[in-house]
From Swiss-Prot:
Cofactor remark: Binds 1 FMN per subunit.
An example Gene Ontology molecular-function term: oxidoreductase activity, acting on NAD(P)H as acceptor
Needed co-factor(s): FMN
Subunit structure: Homodimer.
UniProt-recorded name of the protein: FMN-dependent NADH:quinone oxidoreductase
The entry's keywords: Flavoprotein, FMN, NAD, Oxidoreductase
Keyword Protein transport appears in the UniProt entry: no
Function: Quinone reductase that provides resistance to thiol-specific stress caused by electrophilic quinones.
Amino acid sequence: MTKVLYVSANPKPTELSYSKQVAETFVSTLKAENASIEVEAIELYDVDVQEIDGDVLSAWGKFASGEALTDVEAKKVGTMSGMLEKFMEADLYVFATPMWNFFFPARMKMFLDSVLMAGKTFRYTEQGPVGLLENKQAIHIQGTGGIYTGTDLNFADAYLRQALAFVGVSEVTTVAVEGMNQYPDKIEEIVADAKAKAEALAKEVAGAVTV
């Protein structure tokens, strides 16, 4: 069974989020095309996502020294470990994010801080860091008000690609839902085009899944 982890990072409901609407098209098509696919959806604004703070850094230091964690430290690193476990178990990642000031929302960065973990998803060698995840791929569905594909201002997509490649996930496909603010009279056309691309991609991915 192929496991899909669908992660969205937008406090808006689906009907007000273009990236979520396109992501829902991808996920629903994926499940319709291949019943063996299991999807777990997480909206990062609806769950507890732990940032790296003083307690987390203290806990990491105690792991190395063997000291006991405080209850607060244990709870916080436990939250991060829960996200990490879901991430490691998945075969396919679907990320739906808006662009906010050239990046994605802070909660998405907090999620990545939970899953880029030395000894779990990558390790250090004398030749440098090596990703530990194999045979996984990712889809990034990104909503932007302007046109940012292929520009240096799209830090979010570039960062996500580099972060995933760092842990061994080098197959990343981006579906851009872009230009809604720049071309408000073409919103329906833009979203429909992105949904068509997402649907075609989902059929391709579903067809490649082996049970």
